[in-house]
Amino acid sequence: MKDLLKFLKAQTKTEEFDAIKIALASPDMIRSWSFGEVKKPETINYRTFKPERDGLFCARIFGPVKDYECLCGKYKRLKHRGVICEKCGVEVTQTKVRRERMGHIELASPTAHIWFLKSLPSRIGLLLDMPLRDIERVLYFESYVVIEGGMTNLERQQILTEEQYLDALEEFGDEFDAKMGAEAIQALLKSMDLEQECETLREELNETNSETKRKKLTKRIKLLEAFVQSGNKPEWMILTVLPVLPPDLRPLVPLDGGRFATSDLNDLYRRVINRNNRLKRLLDLAAPDIIVRNEKRMLQEAVDALLDNGRRGRAITGSNKRPLKSLADMIKGKQGRFRQNLLGKRVDYSGRSVITVGPYLRLHQCGLPKKMALELFKPFIYGKLELRGLATTIKAAKKMVEREEAVVWDILDEVIREHPVLLNRAPTLHRLGIQAFEPVLIEGKAIQLHPLVCAAYNADFDGDQMAVHVPLTLEAQLEARALMMSTNNILSPANGEPIIVPSQDVVLGLYYMTRDCVNAKGEGMVLTGPKEAERIYRAGLASLHARVKVRITEYEKDENGEFVATTSLKDTTVGRAILWMIVPKGLPFSIVNQALGKKAISKMLNTCYRILGLKPTVIFADQTMYTGFAYAARSGASVGIDDMVIPEKKHEIISEAEAEVAEIQEQFQSGLVTAGERYNKVIDIWAAANDRVSKAMMDNLQTETVINRDGQEEQQVSFNSIYMMADSGARGSAAQIRQLAGMRGLMAKPDGSIIETPITANFREGLNVLQYFISTHGARKGLADTALKTANSGYLTRRLVDVAQDLVVTEDDCGTHEGILMTPVIEGGDVKEPLRDRVLGRVTAEDVLKPGTADILVPRNTLLHEQWCDLLEANSVDAVKVRSVVSCDTDFGVCAHCYGRDLARGHIINKGEAIGVIAAQSIGEPGTQLTMRTFHIGGAASRAAAESSIQVKNKGSIKLSNVKSVVNSSGKLVITSRNTELKLLDEFGRTKESYKVPYGAVMAKGDGEQVAGGETVANWDPHTMPVITEVSGFIRFTDMIDGQTITRQTDELTGLSSLVVLDSAERTTGGKDLRPALKIVDAQGNDVLIPGTDMPAQYFLPGKAIVQLEDGVQISSGDTLARIPQESGGTKDITGGLPRVADLFEARRPKEPAILAEIAGIVSFGKETKGKRRLVITPVDGSDPYEEMIPKWRQLNVFEGERVERGDVISDGPEAPHDILRLRGVHAVTRYIVNEVQDVYRLQGVKINDKHIEVIVRQMLRKATIESAGSSDFLEGEQVEYSRVKIANRELEANGKVGATFSRDLLGITKASLATESFISAASFQETTRVLTEAAVAGKRDELRGLKENVIVGRLIPAGTGYAYHQDRMRRRAAGEQPATPQVTAEDASASLAELLNAGLGGSDNE
């Protein structure tokens, strides 16, 4: 027995390893793996089905076909194990060695490995510095290459055609050496001196200045250094020995009917062996050169096809015309080894079935069909039966279970008790897609699911299926119970709000229950408490909605957490009093004393969780559900056609609109409006009519008139079923009711343009044929969109997970003082997101001071929970600097303080939490709710876009920031700065509204002045951009020559004449170099200086500028000198929805990005070229000016002589994130991406915490480009991991050396995933071949830091519960311990096993 145990131990030995290295295999290494050479292309004997000797399935090389039995049958049984049969040469051992023993083929001529040849950039080409084309010509025997020039004038690596070679032979004889084929390339690679080459290249690099040459040299140096450091030899890229895959990994399976199913690899290997053997024979026979060459080329092609079929030339096809699957195809793509078998496996002990509702379940339960449970828990049942002595052997137990004896069911009940199972619904978009429940045995065949978890699973009961999995080991059960139980996942990880919220029927029931009604039965009663309320309701003495007075006892927590009771008489309704009975102690009565809609219920559960914690919340959620279902049933709310009340006014509204449309049509026919204007106006009219109809309809539905107790009429909220459903948030929306009872309105064509005749009918009246046909467009587009959206959203999630998968919380506090400044999100007059929502659950980076004092309100490193946020609001703080993952200083991973609160648990995040994956899921999961389309702006929208004034909504004081201004002659402020912001502050100094003020706006109120609500504070002309003078004096024209640089135009209506500056294209040759400008001089004719500088005030005028002043006129500061007409931007498409999110995360450059100033200084314009202007910025400190060419058609925001700061906008447009990072830094680009992504999600009403987007941004900023190397080993211009530069610089500074300087890079998520340090993770994501080729050449080590790599090598992941295991391993490693393997005797083992089973299965009564 002992031997057997030892033997079993030996069979399952595990290797402890810390990293995986990939490198080129040398021929000797391949031979050392091999168990013998495969010499023949035969596979198995078709009569005996035995493998042929020396063939591809040879038993002597690869091992026996049957366990412990040699091929000829001389040795059978375990006792002969390890014997090698002298007759057939097969070792007697397990057959599974056929999965691990490799063979090899000795190639008669070397062949190039296609990956290193054709995977761009070609490694062989880069190493030899030869073009790929030339190398291929040599390899495929079209030309010669010179290997050794000798004393001749031939250069090494020179390519010779057949003729040139023969000429050279005649001329030089055997002075030189030239060959063709892979031998030639092998000789070239072999004779390279890598270190020497490196030296020469580095010297060359220091001498050259041309950018392209430097790039090329750095590439070669990197490759050469990689070879030197990894110990790879260049000639190993040419194969002389080919490894053969173990036969069980490329099986040959006999089908019935004498046919065989085989892996494509066998075909590919057979071709290689056939050609190789033929080549050997030809060489032995000393065949003519041309025949041998042809055979060598064929061998090269066969090896290429085996390694990567189809990479070069046409793919080799099998008998059925489909390309054969080569070794490379085995590992790449969705069906490849990585994604199919290593990252996703099928698991045992699982089942799936349809789901139905389980409204009587508790939150932690699910209904499991008996049939399924019996099958899933079989091993446990067998064990239990044997333990009880009811079955003597496992076989007997099996029989009992198959007969389904009565005792089996009792045992099943025992086994299932307290044994959680996991339920999963595909697609699993976030971690709440798999949760644990305690099974309850039920009859029937469908799984019952608790209704409240449907939101998390996104499940409904229209035929959805779910899978059940059984956690087998004790640890797995523990994790399922502690971490995955549905009761532990009440809050959504995406936004920290409850995800266990009632919906649909439950909401309707609670809403119906808490509504009040005028003059209902029993109004005015005074009741002793909720119990009496329920009694009189059940007795039929009072209606649920009756307004009554009830004595209510509320409990409140004091400082010590004790409950203090207060009792009072409350005005409420019978229904609310009944509902109060299930509300847990500690919540105020006001929480139910209102008509409860979906939002209110969600808020109620949230409050409960924050005040009372997990357990009461779970019980409360369950109770609300039961109550909701019960009262929804009692309400009898139903929908009939009469509930859809059509407003009387509808008819007249539509006829008015029709009249207006007819009028517009007349104007169009008489030529007063253009076709475009007519179309836009018609659409506006119908849109307005539709709104009026729907408003009339909603007003009609919303209220009803009833007689109250005093006999008077009174308005009350309607009890119309449809309205109640929409109002409570149970189902439907105002827009849907509008289609039922209002009018359907305008429809779009398939291309997105709006059809100008609306559908005036609604669904109650019914549509006619034309209307129905028009409707079909939209309906079909909706379906097509949904299908596309799902795929796109899934792909976005996959890329996000891949880029963030290795980000884990690794330490408690990194100690940084960096952070990002959080302010409320304000757009125009609305606060889109208040400050408390943005800072809740974050850690302060600096002390927060009480506004206007030096008192510390919140100390540094405080986790801001709800109470702190209340304090901030009470003290009207409107900006808080909080820690952020983007600025976290941890080298690998992030620290808990920079992340803040774990949103799903409500406390600070634990170490080992996989925040990267959580972030990716939180952003990706709502992806399917985003729209797919780009929005076209036309009609009403585009006209409203040209604003010309700012009107504030609230009263308060004005605060201007980034402002330069002058006072004009009438005493008003005129803005002369570009990016001025106007904020409206309330009396506490909180920002209520925020607006952008353009250049040239005239302010009605100045900085710090008080305004009333509704007041207009700024005006400007939206169609022209003014040129405003900052000084007073007299105008002097310079270079303004009529006919050359300017032309006079007279307005026909007013008779005023104005000067228009000609565009440089329209000028005569004499006027090309003139620079028209307006100079301001004083009465003596001297230049006036711009205040604060020593520059004369002169304003250069761009083309098309209009001047309405004459030479020599007196002007005062703040006056408009000239106007530049702005072309109104045509209808620009706004990319919205999913494509916009993808663009942001992929960091794509917009089509026409904004042009930003690269340095601070004074703007001037240099010499123009065709179609472009030269913009020159000269720094004030006199360093080198910066030049940029800008296309003429771009509208510029700056004038000559203006001062700009680095990062200022020179020409408007969407900003490119790379520019923001380069010019304004990491925080600015974070703020930009976070805000832009949030805008898209906010439009759809999806809440995601900023943290998640910041996590992804941190991963996008993973790389840095070295600017100067200092004393480090980096090359300049090299892109390296930011953490590596940080660590290297820290070490260098500690030794007093100079560190490297670098700039951060922003990579898109796909690029960032492929650029990770881990080649395993990158290879399993995309472009497998390229990643593996690169890694092999560089001899990369994968440190297995991320989650993906560890899943692939089959270990616990270094996150969650696996985090401790990895920490422990590292500690043991550091201490140099060996993991102890205890010496166990068989008796001990079996005893402890029995003990464990008893303890684990609750049967320790020793029967």
UniProtKB/Swiss-Prot annotation:
<dbReference type="Pfam" id="PF04998">
    <property type="entry name" value="RNA_pol_Rpb1_5"/>
</dbReference>
<keyword id="KW-0460">Magnesium</keyword>
<feature type="binding site">
    <location>
        <position position="898"/>
    </location>
    <ligand>
        <name>Zn(2+) 2</name>
    </ligand>
</feature>
<keyword id="KW-0808">Transferase</keyword>
<dbReference type="InterPro" id="IPR012754">
    <property type="entry name" value="DNA-dir_RpoC_beta_prime_bact"/>
</dbReference>
<dbReference type="Pfam" id="PF04983">
    <property type="entry name" value="RNA_pol_Rpb1_3"/>
</dbReference>
<feature type="binding site">
    <location>
        <position position="464"/>
    </location>
    <ligand>
        <name>Mg(2+)</name>
    </ligand>
</feature>
<feature type="binding site">
    <location>
        <position position="85"/>
    </location>
    <ligand>
        <name>Zn(2+) 1</name>
    </ligand>
</feature>
<dbReference type="Pfam" id="PF04997">
    <property type="entry name" value="RNA_pol_Rpb1_1"/>
</dbReference>
<dbReference type="Pfam" id="PF05000">
    <property type="entry name" value="RNA_pol_Rpb1_4"/>
</dbReference>
<dbReference type="InterPro" id="IPR000722">
    <property type="entry name" value="RNA_pol_asu"/>
</dbReference>
<dbReference type="InterPro" id="IPR038120">
    <property type="entry name" value="Rpb1_funnel_sf"/>
</dbReference>
<feature type="binding site">
    <location>
        <position position="72"/>
    </location>
    <ligand>
        <name>Zn(2+) 1</name>
    </ligand>
</feature>
<feature type="binding site">
    <location>
        <position position="462"/>
    </location>
    <ligand>
        <name>Mg(2+)</name>
    </ligand>
</feature>
<dbReference type="InterPro" id="IPR007081">
    <property type="entry name" value="RNA_pol_Rpb1_5"/>
</dbReference>
<feature type="binding site">
    <location>
        <position position="460"/>
    </location>
    <ligand>
        <name>Mg(2+)</name>
    </ligand>
</feature>
<comment type="function">
    <text>DNA-dependent RNA polymerase catalyzes the transcription of DNA into RNA using the four ribonucleoside triphosphates as substrates.</text>
</comment>
<keyword id="KW-0240">DNA-directed RNA polymerase</keyword>
<dbReference type="Pfam" id="PF00623">
    <property type="entry name" value="RNA_pol_Rpb1_2"/>
</dbReference>
<keyword id="KW-0548">Nucleotidyltransferase</keyword>
<feature type="binding site">
    <location>
        <position position="895"/>
    </location>
    <ligand>
        <name>Zn(2+) 2</name>
    </ligand>
</feature>
<comment type="subunit">
    <text>The RNAP catalytic core consists of 2 alpha, 1 beta, 1 beta' and 1 omega subunit. When a sigma factor is associated with the core the holoenzyme is formed, which can initiate transcription.</text>
</comment>
<dbReference type="InterPro" id="IPR042102">
    <property type="entry name" value="RNA_pol_Rpb1_3_sf"/>
</dbReference>
<keyword id="KW-0862">Zinc</keyword>
<protein>
    <recommendedName>
        <fullName>DNA-directed RNA polymerase subunit beta'</fullName>
        <ecNumber>2.7.7.6</ecNumber>
    </recommendedName>
</protein>
<feature type="binding site">
    <location>
        <position position="88"/>
    </location>
    <ligand>
        <name>Zn(2+) 1</name>
    </ligand>
</feature>
<dbReference type="InterPro" id="IPR007083">
    <property type="entry name" value="RNA_pol_Rpb1_4"/>
</dbReference>
<dbReference type="InterPro" id="IPR007080">
    <property type="entry name" value="RNA_pol_Rpb1_1"/>
</dbReference>
<dbReference type="GO" id="GO:0008270">
    <property type="term" value="F:zinc ion binding"/>
</dbReference>
<comment type="similarity">
    <text>Belongs to the RNA polymerase beta' chain family.</text>
</comment>
<dbReference type="GO" id="GO:0003677">
    <property type="term" value="F:DNA binding"/>
</dbReference>
<dbReference type="InterPro" id="IPR007066">
    <property type="entry name" value="RNA_pol_Rpb1_3"/>
</dbReference>
<keyword id="KW-0804">Transcription</keyword>
<dbReference type="InterPro" id="IPR045867">
    <property type="entry name" value="DNA-dir_RpoC_beta_prime"/>
</dbReference>
<dbReference type="GO" id="GO:0000287">
    <property type="term" value="F:magnesium ion binding"/>
</dbReference>
<feature type="binding site">
    <location>
        <position position="888"/>
    </location>
    <ligand>
        <name>Zn(2+) 2</name>
    </ligand>
</feature>
<dbReference type="InterPro" id="IPR006592">
    <property type="entry name" value="RNA_pol_N"/>
</dbReference>
<dbReference type="GO" id="GO:0000428">
    <property type="term" value="C:DNA-directed RNA polymerase complex"/>
</dbReference>
<feature type="binding site">
    <location>
        <position position="814"/>
    </location>
    <ligand>
        <name>Zn(2+) 2</name>
    </ligand>
</feature>
<dbReference type="GO" id="GO:0003899">
    <property type="term" value="F:DNA-directed RNA polymerase activity"/>
</dbReference>
<feature type="binding site">
    <location>
        <position position="70"/>
    </location>
    <ligand>
        <name>Zn(2+) 1</name>
    </ligand>
</feature>
<keyword id="KW-0479">Metal-binding</keyword>
